[in-house]
Amino acid sequence: LSGAVVMKKFGLTPKGKAFSGITVEDDKPVQLTRQILKSLKWIGPAECEFLKDEKGHYFLMEINSRFPSWLYLAAAAGQNLPLLTVQLACDMPVRPLTSYTAGKLFVRTVADALLDARQIMELTASGEVRL
């Protein structure tokens, strides 16, 4: 495991997806992820999602074979995971990322785009829109 950031969700959509979260200091999910990915002989980005119960027990909920959707939070916390992945893929020497800043927060937002119907037709016909 060359890099890992633990994020706690605290804003969820009705489908359980995080729209806000915070980096936390908790080595247990990192240890569990390391064990799981080693057992799978996994190479490449991955996200292991755990549920922690009130007794402090962790339950694996899912494994995603990609970077997490909150990847920018990892970078804000001090780990550039895509760069690390490229360096590993290119057989470049890397120093495992073993620390990050706890207390970094992300909030996902949505922005509306207003277009004229002609612009939609232009996009459909040409693949681009001139604004």
PLM features: residue spans?
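ATP-dependent carboxylate/phosphate-activation module, predominantly the ATP-grasp catalytic core
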Residues: 1-41, 45, 52, 64-89
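Conserved protein kinase catalytic/activation segment
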Residues: 56-58
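Peripheral (often C-terminal) accessory segments that flank ATP-dependent C-N-forming ligase machineries
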Residues: 83-131
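Pre-DFG segment of protein kinase catalytic domains
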Residues: 60-62
